[in-house]
Amino acid sequence: MSHKIMAINAGSSSLKFQLLAMPQGEMICQGLIERIGMSDAQVTLKAPAQKWQETLPVADHREAVTLLLEKLLSHNIISSLEEIDGVGHRVAHGGESFKDSARVTDETLAEIERLAELAPLHNPVNALGIAVFRQLLPKTPAVAVFDTAFHQTLDEPSFIYPLPWRYYSELGIRRYGFHGTSHKYVSAQLAEKLGVPLSALRVVCCHLGNGSSICAIKGGHSVNTSMGFTPQSGVMMGTRSGDIDPSILPWIALREGKTPQQLNQLLNNESGLLGVSGVSPDYRDVEHAADTGNHQAALALTLFAERIRATIGSYIMQMGGLDALVFTGGIGENSARARAAICHNLNFLGLAVDEEKNQRNATFIQTENAVVKVAVINTNEELMIAQDVMRLAISETVTLGIPA
């Protein structure tokens, strides 16, 4: 039996969605409402053979959700709201409370709101999206899917920071990790494509985009990941610095009189590829600048690759070897240059990339005799969310090959 499942990603001023037919995973419709709260909000809906765009005022998220449901009806995507069998919501932070996705209840929603102190930019609007859908579709089961849940299998040496213990025990400061939904989906897809149980593999997954994170996956479980207490830490990103010497921050604060909020702006929005290149946070723009002789742009590309290489190396040490390296995300899926730079001169690991396969974005890009598989796999977080709705709310398991 086919079920219509909606996957929702609510941002501070946007609402992204997909409506999927499950368990087959076919996209029925997808769309985005941008500039929520403005008089010129952009509404875009796409079905396999059609596209609709409109500009109109959208006051808030409740109005956005109402508009979305109205558009699905008016464009005959669905004939009634009762056709929507379940809704899955992406939630940024589940803290230590959620080790898996969870059915939405009053208690679940309250805990998501409480965890807003760990993700003040994301959890409040995620909770708002859940609340609005519950009001408008009160009989439709909902599931919260947490970016952090996949990383709850990290052991203490991998998640504890070397700070006074009370900062963990009282304030919950620890490595949480993010992009978990993507890492979980891509690693399962890898195992399926290899025809090998995920439980038998040691994998490093590189989710590379404007936000980037690396994840070590052993036996199907996350054992380490580069993002930490916040999505700011780890490798260099589009506008985020990733890991730096922490004493730089008080030094800058004293020298330039910056507030904590200004320092956060510096680290999150003015650093990374943009900060070093002085050109753009977009990897493609930095590539172009580097090719026209811009030294800072070329340096930014080198830094980006070297930080990732160092992280991969540490994870290989932790897992005692490597069976597969996987690239996903906007840069990981589309930039042959980035993949080549990250995999350069790793023959000593039994890892080598075939240039022709890499240039055409083949699924497997390793050379014929390479020991380590190198894969390029498109992530699909919306499908992963829909699969969790099926598993937890519709009581139909979609097999992903992920160990329990």
Swiss-Prot record:
Q: Is DNA-binding one of the keywords?
A: no
What EC number(s) would the UniProt record show? 2.7.2.15
The enzyme's main class, written as a single word, is transferase
Name the reaction it catalyses.
Answer: propanoate + ATP = propanoyl phosphate + ADP
**Which pathway features in its UniProt record?**
Polyol metabolism; 1,2-propanediol degradation
Primary location group? cytoplasm
Alphabetized UniProt keyword annotations:
ATP-binding, Cytoplasm, Kinase, Nucleotide-binding, Transferase
Cross-referenced InterPro entries, in alphabetical order?
Ac/propionate_kinase (IPR004372), Aliphatic_acid_kin_short-chain (IPR000890), Aliphatic_acid_kinase_CS (IPR023865), ATPase_NBD (IPR043129), Propionate_kinase_PduW (IPR024896)
Query: In the UniProt record, does the keyword Lyase occur?
Result: no
SUPFAM superfamilies (UniProt xref): Actin-like ATPase domain
Q: Which GO terms describe its cellular component?
A: cytoplasm
| Gene Ontology MF terms in the entry | acetate kinase activity; ATP binding; propionate kinase activity
Instruction: Kindly give the Pfam families that the UniProt entry links to this protein.
Output: Acetate_kinase
Cellular compartments annotated = Cytoplasm
Which GO terms fall under biological process for this protein? acetate metabolic process; propanediol catabolic process; propionate catabolic process
The free-text function statement in the UniProt record for this protein reads: Works with phosphate acetyltransferase (pta) to capture exogenous propionate and regenerate propionyl-CoA during degradation of 1,2-propanediol (1,2-PD). Expression of a cosmid containing the full 21-gene pdu operon in E.coli allows E.coli to grow on 1,2-propanediol (1,2-PD) with the appearance of bacterial microcompartments (BMC) in its cytoplasm.
Family recorded in the similarity comment: Belongs to the acetokinase family. PduW subfamily.
What protein is this chain from? Propionate kinase
